[in-house]
Amino acid sequence: MVLIKEREMEIPVIDFAELDGEKRSKTMSLLDHACDKWGFFMVDNHGIDKELMEKVKKMINSHYEEHLKEKFYQSEMVKALSEGKTSDADWESSFFISHKPTSNICQIPNISEELSKTMDEYVCQLHKFAERLSKLMCENLGLDQEDIMNAFSGPKGPAFGTKVAKYPECPRPELMRGLREHTDAGGIILLLQDDQVPGLEFFKDGKWVPIPPSKNNTIFVNTGDQLEILSNGRYKSVVHRVMTVKHGSRLSIATFYNPAGDAIISPAPKLLYPSGYRFQDYLKLYSTTKFGDKGPRLETMKKMGNADSA
């Protein structure tokens, strides 16, 4: 494992190539430490075609420039900021692609056939990586290899989708966040991000840790609220945000390996805690409390699960 130093905080980098040799035990221990103590880390040698990753980034950037940039800068939010006014909004241009259990990419405006095919190819490789990572997490938690996958599954398996976002240049970065402070609602988040423009920050040990741009197409991973519940609090979701910058437009392609909407979520039986709830019920609560403290939200769901099992 390599450690990237950023403002005296070392960000774990897990080398998946070391999982197949004599260093496997050490690498598994380092992965467990990253999940347990950090909630975010980078993965190198993940097995995803790096030329394909470059192609995805290039095509998404071109799509933004051609179809979304002008619309963003003509929005009421941008006009208000030019007058020094702020609102509870995020300085981002984004859309969401659902991949599994059903795809919606053909319904998204101005997505070319080439971009659609390229995303499908990338997501296919990324899905295999997500499943491999979930199995490794299960192993470290003392669970059966497919426990996370099974817990996340509805009738058609776990949900898999991608938030594509650009965080454009902002004339008043002191007044706006690219994305306000929050934890992620779902399970395992796999981020392909900009290799030049920074902005992502995670909160750890009382301070904000800036995440550097991803060189050499490493995958940045963080764990969401449902993995915290499933692991009975061992693998915690972490508060993060995106800062705006005056110069440079940051790209973020975040893919979510999530429970199906009707999946029943509870801590794994081997890790105790008896309650369970539907992920879609959690999302309803999350939609109104996303930018608040996650603690009361998780406690509410625990109580709901206890009531349902009583």
From Swiss-Prot:
Keywords in alphabetical order: Coiled coil, Ethylene biosynthesis, Iron, Metal-binding, Oxidoreductase, Plant defense, Vitamin C
Domain Fe2OG dioxygenase: 158-259
InterPro entries: DIOX_N (IPR026992), IPNS-like_FE2OG_OXY (IPR044861), IPNS-like_sf (IPR027443), Oxoglu/Fe-dep_dioxygenase_dom (IPR005123), Plant_2OG-oxidoreductases (IPR050295)
Family: Belongs to the iron/ascorbate-dependent oxidoreductase family.
Induction: Upon potassium K(+) and iron deprivation. Induced in leaf blades in low light intensities. Seems repressed by ethylene. Accumulates in response to very-long-chain fatty acids (VLCFAs C20:0 to C30:0). Induced in roots by nitric oxide (NO).
Chain segments annotated as coiled-coil in the UniProt record: 113-133
Gene3D superfamilies to which the protein is assigned, alphabetical: B-lactam Antibiotic, Isopenicillin N Synthase, Chain
The protein, known as: 1-aminocyclopropane-1-carboxylate oxidase 1
MF terms in GO: 1-aminocyclopropane-1-carboxylate oxidase activity; L-ascorbic acid binding; metal ion binding
Residues given in the record as 2-oxoglutarate binding sites: 250
An annotated GO BP: cellular response to potassium ion starvation
Species whose genome carries this gene: Arabidopsis thaliana (Mouse-ear cress)
Claim: Flavoprotein is one of the keywords in the record: no
UniProt cofactor note: Binds 1 Fe(2+) ion per subunit.
Gene: ACO1
Function per UniProt: Enzyme involved in the ethylene biosynthesis. May promote stem elongation by maximizing the extensibility cells, possibly by activating ethylene biosynthesis, in response to very-long-chain fatty acids (VLCFAs C20:0 to C30:0).
Reaction equation(s) it catalyzes: 1-aminocyclopropane-1-carboxylate + L-ascorbate + O2 = ethene + L-dehydroascorbate + hydrogen cyanide + CO2 + 2 H2O
